[in-house]
Amino acid sequence: MAEVDYATLKKGGFMRQKQKDNFSLRLQVVGGALTVENLKKIAEVAEKYGDGHVHLTSRQGVEIPFIKLQDIDEVKEELAKGGCKPGVCGPRVRTVTACQGNQICPSGNIDTYELAVELDKRYFGRELPHKFKFGVTGCQNNCLKAEENDVGIKGALNVKWLEDKCINCGVCEKACRTEAIKIEDGKVIVDYDKCNYCGRCAKACPTDAWDAKAAYILSFGGT
């Protein structure tokens, strides 16, 4: 019987379990998004080749445990039919995580999924001295905890007051959580040292009196 190359299997997402010749398969999931087709195939494989359940990881991943050694090649073929691929383990670029971003969330400032797909396309699985993680979050609510990733990307809005559209209603001042906005003598004053570029002022304004451009806040090193 040929010797099993456990290192190569782990590199390709198949992690050894404590049960002999059983593996938990980590799948490649980009930005936490799975289609109905993906989900159906994952359920089918988990039922046929696993023990009928999956594990949702802390980084938006999916793992199918109790895959038998002799079924590994067949499992990969079956998953491919549903648009699913094995993930990676070890010292390489891991799953790119993302919140739902501005395509769904009212607070989102950037298209997080589009960015996650691009990062995944460029870097996923790349060999490095240590495991490496990207995280993309859409706004200052920071649902994805961007700073905990080796590279964190947080959506922001660069805002500029447009005096000719302003009706001095004060909504922007009330919306600002960092007290960066003050209205003085009919003018909106922005203290950019206090501004966290959340964009709440622009989104709350009833007359579109803010020029708002998407931007990115980057963090490096993780926690």
Please place each PLM-identified region on the residue numbering.
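N-terminal basic/disordered segments at the start of proteins
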Residues: M1-K41
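Iron-sulfur cluster-binding cysteine motifs and their immediate structural context
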Residues: V171-V188, N196, R200-Y216
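Long insertion/accessory domains within large nucleic-acid-processing enzymes
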Residues: E147, L218-S219
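Small-residue-enriched alpha-helical segments and adjacent helix-cap loops
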Residues: L25-V159, K165-I167
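Catalytic residues for metal-mediated phosphoryl-transfer on nucleic acids/nucleotides
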Residues: D208, G221-T223
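Short, flexible, solvent-exposed loop/turn segments with mixed acidic/basic and small polar residues
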Residues: F14-Q19, G50-L56, K182
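Cys/His-enriched microdomains
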Residues: R94-T97, F134, W161-K174, V190-K203
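Conserved alpha/beta core surface patches that mediate binding of polyanionic ligands
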Residues: A2-K11, A33, F134, L144-A156, ...
